[in-house]
């Protein structure tokens, strides 16, 4: 049911309920000044298709307040509903089920209306401007610039980019932000790792630093640094390798710039773009961390104990107070996070969403407590969080734990290339991997990583990603789109068909249960998008697309499209064209391509 139809039916049912309630309560209630307030009408699709198209339980909710039997009440509501002129073109029939469920069947014309809506609106179908004028900052990935992006970052990138698209579909202006943790212990470890490689050491050698990173990429950084190469991140200043093995600060700056560039390349391969990169180091250089700490001290939110500065996080629901500044004068890792979120608020983002790994769960209360303690108007519960669990990579039935690039973990680029069909070991020669392989891999990785709820662990099966059959969910959905393209191309060539003529097709020809079910699924797309945005649940789009592809395949297997009779042929072509458009729209939400041939 389309949103406009749903709103109309809800209004008709609400009016019917008021009529029945007034008749039951009579003038006594009115004379006593008792206003009857009906509950909000909730419409759902019945779990069993035979029960109709729409179900409502309002009679069971109101039976007790109105002092009547729920089934009898349902009969009165249905009688009032079907008597209304507005319902006669929308509702074909109504029946009472069980203790008082109202099951409605929509008219054929009401079901068919979705085809015209999709064909008229095209890529805009399903979107809304209900949140127009509102801004959202969505922070995701936010990796340390100490190595290539790993599969956990990949899950964040897929979830974040898809969620940004879904939220934007409701009218929000979405600002995508990447927070670079370019300050702290990890950056120091990166510098000494690169320095050790520049001196000719390798993992396992005497003198190799215990905290050093072992990936081969460190050797590449050291080589380019010693050779005087110049590197730059997309938003950064060029940094030239000094070639001085003793200048640790120069090594650090070069290594950070090198890895920021590499992460930019990872994100480009993944099809993810950001509006802004925010550097943690800038919070220190601009004095924002100190300013935030001073403000919390002045607000009475801190105390000294054992030589450390503590934040009263228990005031905001944390299980214990937390150290802000250690006895050696350094800050704990959540302190710059508080300062960073102050900048988000000061930049006018009253709605902020962070996508992070579930290992960050403990920082939520600390960051929120710090923000509340500043007393600058930030609401409780700011920011929102989407936490995701880990990803395990499997190939040939075995877990893959390391890669040639990173040494100790699987990178996003590994996953893209393997899922696109690159042979094991081919990542060592990336110039030999063509764009088609990257596209296939990117589509598979993005769809797979979005296809489960964020708070569930995910097993990424490389072998499944390579299958070209119904077991592979992204192939299943993309194949539905490609098959429709093929049928419509044949319809054009064989019958001189024009897509522009499809809105005039006689849709009354669509009489089969499979056609009705497919149209019903198409009509659910706008409400599904709204739900996905409200619940911060981009996986709902992946679930929907699999269901839509299934409905299409059921229809296609049950009915021939290219029949001799023009009227049913064009009606079925119109249904296919609408289905193709919604598949394309949904795949675009996930950042996945909609191929015309496979």
Curated annotation (Swiss-Prot):
One Gene Ontology cellular component term attached to this UniProt record is: cytoplasm
Q: What is this protein called?
A: Arginine--tRNA ligase
Return the EC number: 6.1.1.19
Quote the HAMAP family the UniProt record gives: Arg_tRNA_synth
Keyword Coiled coil among record annotations = no
What Pfam families does this protein's entry cite?
Answer: Arg_tRNA_synt_N (PF03485), DALR_1 (PF05746), tRNA-synt_1d (PF00750)
Q: InterPro entries this protein is in?
A: aa-tRNA-synth_I_CS, Arg-tRNA-ligase, Arg-tRNA-synth_N, Arg-tRNA-synth_N_sf, ArgRS_core, DALR_anticod-bd, Rossmann-like_a/b/a_fold, tRNAsynth_Ia_anticodon-bd
Per the Swiss-Prot or TrEMBL record, what residue ranges does the short sequence motif 'HIGH' region cover? 143-153
Subunit arrangement? Monomer.
Q: Does the keyword ATP-binding apply?
A: yes
One GO biological process this protein is involved in is:
arginyl-tRNA aminoacylation
Residue pairs linked by disulfide bridges in the UniProt entry? none
Write down the chemical reaction(s) this protein catalyses. tRNA(Arg) + L-arginine + ATP = L-arginyl-tRNA(Arg) + AMP + diphosphate
What's the superkingdom here? Bacteria
Q: Which GO terms describe its molecular function?
A: arginine-tRNA ligase activity; ATP binding
Q: Say which enzyme class the record assigns.
A: ligase
Assigned protein family: Belongs to the class-I aminoacyl-tRNA synthetase family.
Record key words, sorted: Aminoacyl-tRNA synthetase, ATP-binding, Cytoplasm, Ligase, Nucleotide-binding, Protein biosynthesis
| Compartments where found | Cytoplasm
